[in-house]
């Protein structure tokens, strides 16, 4: 029972933080700008500086102080005197600052509540870094996969209600509604009958991504908790848990009932081999369960979203596949279970035997076709993978050309260092190296062969950053045995900041 209480624990003392006064502080917009700028350095987005002007922020804050109240005209939004003519620009500026402010309660939850306590109250938090241990799991004993397309069309009021559970500040929620209405009235593509946001991964607005993730984590936290108690997840027994407004009030009483009445029988339904992971708009369940059990999971999830979160979900958005015949696609990797044969020679007295063993192993491979497509789109090669020159960079100096190509090559090697087989990665690096040579030869009006012959074999050393050198920097005190063991597969936790070219979607 203590474990369940700890899992569902909510720090109620942090529910009443008032965020609305922070909206009128200029430094909040500076912090939001710096935060987004730092994240965009590796993404090579030089135009971001032009999206925020402190003069605009000062004018906006002055208007916010002078405005007594927000008036939203349902039928005539163009008469709104608060935003004036620069409606889209002001809405975008407020959205950037508000998205930074509304994340504060979630950051606070990562800080220990009292000094001297090293335990972080983050039991319900999820991270993209959970993908790495998922790909390192042993799937040899599992056989079924549920591919789930998470519902992404969400009504505006549902998003506000989700934040209401964590942010007890009515003024901030009213401002959020105001921003939603302004976005709705200003966006010509939103003239549909139903007011809802389509949270597709292609949208880059920070506020929309944050609201989408908070919405997903809202039902994911309940779903994961219920999954830990029973693999069948009978909604008749746990339905009262899903009334989120009174969730933490009822939790103490229900945990006692649960511990007394259900603990004795739930062990029969537990599935200790269930693995769960979420990435972008898709979640995956890998289990040892039978097809009948996976079908129960499928229809439970559909009813779970429809009945308790007001999301219309069709059963066709949940796919059941067999793991040996299925490929998982996460963070630019293609992962699948392969049979790796191994032969062992055994000798007994004068007789020797050859024993063939086939071991199941999850291989993470570099998707060569999508990567070549990305390189072709960026004009490094054609659709067949043949390297071509980059005319747009021919006007740069030789060192700048080599630096740009070398940075892309290093990013790709860094990103796909977790691949179990790097043959495809070597081919991609070859394409980039030859494209660099053709670009330099084009600049000097020479052929590639003559250009390389003149410079010698030491040319393009920027591309020859071997994994042993990377390991020596990452693990300077590691022994040679340690480096040899981990040379084939390394996960870097900062790959989510790498250039868009490495994300081969």
From Swiss-Prot:
Its main location: plastid. Keywords: Chloroplast, mRNA processing, Plastid, RNA-binding, tRNA processing. One of its GO terms (molecular function) is RNA binding. One of its GO terms (biological process) is RNA splicing. Disulfide bonds: none annotated. InterPro entries: Domain_X (IPR024937), Maturase_MatK (IPR002866), Maturase_MatK_N (IPR024942). Belongs to the intron maturase 2 family. MatK subfamily. Usually encoded in the trnK tRNA gene intron. Probably assists in splicing its own and other chloroplast group II introns. This is Maturase K. The gene is matK.
